[in-house]
Amino acid sequence: VQRFLSARKNRKVTIAEIGAEAQPNNRAVLSASEVEKYDPETFADNLALAKERARKGKGCNAIIEWSPHSNIELNSNGSPLRLGSNPEESFVVLAHELIHAQHILAGTSKAYNGGDRYDETSEAGKEELRAVGVGKYEYRKTRQPSENSIRQEHGLPIRKKYKPHGR
């Protein structure tokens, strides 16, 4: 487990290593001082408060679950196929999750506003498009880092959508 501090709002990102077969993920969590302040009764209450802060401009800490042994395999059209096992491209998955973490820390995440992350019209779907950097979220339009801006910097194929091929 590695921890990194954010210069903004004294927020922290924790990166926890997971197995190569596990799905990468991130989650909003309260800091120790926020737990003391809000005194959630259960961990579920902690997560609910953190999700609200992650999307309502206040921000909170983030935990990233990531494997240094996994990558996203794309087909020739730039559609994701599956979670692969190329550790040389695992940094792209980490970059994607760090983009989400940046939004959680800033309180601008759309991930917790509801909807299916594979539905590009839902708020959760828009958060994924933002992290990937497609459509109106392309780097050339936003100047915000994205999975695709990282892919481009490293000469890797661009991801054209979030939703996996055939889903």
Locate each region found by the language model.
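Short, surface-exposed beta-strand/loop "edge" segments at domain boundaries and coil↔beta transitions
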Residues: 1, 21-25, 71-77, 137-143
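Zn2+-dependent metallopeptidase catalytic core
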Residues: 1-35
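Short, flexible helical or helix-coil boundary motifs
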Residues: 8, 12, 102, 139-142
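Ser/Thr- (and often Asn-) enriched beta-sheet segments in non-cytosolic proteins
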Residues: 12-16, 29, 63-65, 149, ...
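Active-site scaffold of zinc-dependent metalloenzymes
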Residues: 25-91, 101-104
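An amphipathic, basic-hydrophobic helix/alpha-beta surface used to engage anionic
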Residues: 94
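Active-site or metal-binding loop neighborhoods of secreted/extracellular toxin and effector enzymes
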Residues: 105-167
